[in-house]
Amino acid sequence: MDPNTVSSFQDILMRMSKMQLGSSSEDLNGMITQFESLKLYRDSLGEAVMRMGDLHSLQNRNGKWREQLGQKFEEIRWLIEEVRHKLKITENSFEQITFIQALQLLFEVEQEIRTFSFQLI
């Protein structure tokens, strides 16, 4: 797991939590929760890959791991669309930078999850 990705997650979550987007703060809190969930999922997949013999254990723990993987990719696509939308409507440069970095992070995480999942298949 790339330490830069971990610090990027922490940095973006911290900055997003400080933003006040008026009536859409509830949406932002939902995005933050999704980011945190995605980070945990990515970390657990990465750990499973590190143990490499853990596919059997992963399948036993969650017989529907492929379905869960598909749901995570849907969440990533949803988050990408939400971040793009927020980026389009915000005029604050601090928020724009944060959303651009969040978008880059989502693309990186999507690629990492794809790589991990191919190694597990």
From Swiss-Prot:
Subunit-level organization: Interacts with protein M1. May interact with host nucleoporin RAB/HRB and exportin XPO1/CRM1.
Record-stated family: Belongs to the influenza viruses NEP family.
Additional information: Average number present in a viral particle is estimated to be 130-200 molecules.
Superkingdom classification of source: Viruses
UniProt-listed SUPFAM superfamilies: Nonstructural protein ns2, Nep, M1-binding domain
GO cellular component assignments: host cell nucleus; virion component
Extent of motif Nuclear export signal: 12-21, 85-94
This protein's name: Nuclear export protein
Subcellular location per the Swiss-Prot or TrEMBL entry: Virion; Host nucleus
Function as written in the Swiss-Prot or TrEMBL entry: Mediates the nuclear export of encapsidated genomic RNAs (ribonucleoproteins, RNPs). Acts as an adapter between viral RNPs complexes and the nuclear export machinery of the cell. Possesses no intrinsic RNA-binding activity, but includes a C-terminal M1-binding domain. This domain is believed to allow recognition of RNPs bound to the protein M1.
One biological process term in Gene Ontology: exit of virus from host cell nucleus through nuclear pore
Main location: virion
